[in-house]
């Protein structure tokens, strides 16, 4: 893993946007894997700003998001489809039909998972996958204990994850109990991975990630086995790791 240490959230976002922008500029055709949550928000803002400054078109880009809640229609303001439209898709010239998220309203969720996996394969795989991390090490919605061999599947969300995401919903009860997520193997098949880690709440997770122990109990640990991962971590996220390193 190539680890880039930055000062804070803003510097992390700028660096991440610059890296993504470079890949978008340099490729005649590119497939991005995208993430939601608080972590990548300013990366998207910075990416839009770069596109505007440079007159860069996104018409050659297609995207696949990591995950989507089950039971929320696309128009629901808490759906990840809505999140992506508000924060990125509506501000760049990417054709809407080239933006993909799992459909959490599909009549057969199992069928939807298979179709999503096939669509990624038909697109030739993901060139660069943007990732955040849960404090319990989850990536996408792959909670601890998820097999490393998993493909896109339906998950029951851990209570910890529902609580962490409750800040976006009126009450904890409104947070969906299930989601569709790319599997860990799906994520590992991306040619390149960009993991962003910011803030004190992620400090233990970052330290664990750097401990080199690869275990299904900490899903992100598998990233140690991927040949092309860049991690951008800010000072707060790196604080526990830095302390341990100096002991
Ligand atoms: N499914 C998402 C993940 O894709 C995200 O990386 C993670 C961290 O979220 P945040 O960036 O808000 O801390 O939790 C959510 O549950």
From Swiss-Prot:
Catalyzes the reversible isomerization-deamination of glucosamine 6-phosphate (GlcN6P) to form fructose 6-phosphate (Fru6P) and ammonium ion. This is Glucosamine-6-phosphate deaminase. Keywords: Carbohydrate metabolism, Hydrolase. GO terms for molecular function: glucosamine-6-phosphate deaminase activity; identical protein binding. Pathway: Amino-sugar metabolism; N-acetylneuraminate degradation; D-fructose 6-phosphate from N-acetylneuraminate: step 5/5. The keyword Iron does not apply. The active site is at 67 (proton acceptor), 136 (for ring-opening step), 138 (proton acceptor), 143 (for ring-opening step). It comes from the Bacteria. GO terms for biological process: carbohydrate metabolic process; glucosamine catabolic process; N-acetylglucosamine catabolic process; N-acetylneuraminate catabolic process. GO terms for cellular component: cytoplasm. Transmembrane segments: none annotated.
């Amino acid at each position: 893993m190539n680890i880039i240490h930055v000062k804070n959230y803003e510097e992390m976002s700028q660096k991440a946007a610059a890296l993504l922008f470079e890949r978008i500029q340099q490729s005649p055709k590119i497939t991005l894997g995208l993430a939601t949550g608080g972590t990548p928000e300013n990366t998207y803002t910075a990416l839009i700003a770069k596109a505007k400054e440079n007159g860069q078109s996104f018409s050659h880009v297609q995207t696949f998001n990591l995950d989507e809640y089950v039971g929320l229609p696309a128009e629901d303001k808490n759906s990840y489809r809505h999140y992506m439209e508000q924060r990125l898709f509506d501000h760049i010239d990417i054709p809407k039909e080239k933006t993909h998220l799992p459909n959490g309203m599909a009549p057969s969720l199992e069928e939807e998972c298979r179709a999503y996996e096939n669509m990624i394969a038909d697109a030739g795989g993901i060139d660069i996958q943007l990732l955040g991390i849960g404090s319990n090490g989850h990536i996408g919605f792959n909670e601890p204990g998820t097999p490393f061999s998993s493909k896109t599947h339906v998950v029951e969300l851990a209570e910890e994850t529902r609580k962490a995401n409750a800040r976006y919903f009126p009450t904890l009860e409104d947070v969906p109990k299930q989601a569709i997520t790319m599997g860990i193997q799906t994520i590992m098949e991306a040619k390149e991975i960009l993991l962003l880690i910011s803030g004190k709440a992620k400090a233990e997770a970052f330290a664990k990630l750097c401990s080199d122990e690869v275990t299904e109990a900490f899903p992100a640990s598998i990233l140690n086995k991927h040949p092309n991962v860049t991690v951008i971590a800010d000072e707060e996220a790196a604080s526990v790791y830095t302390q341990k390193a100096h002991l």
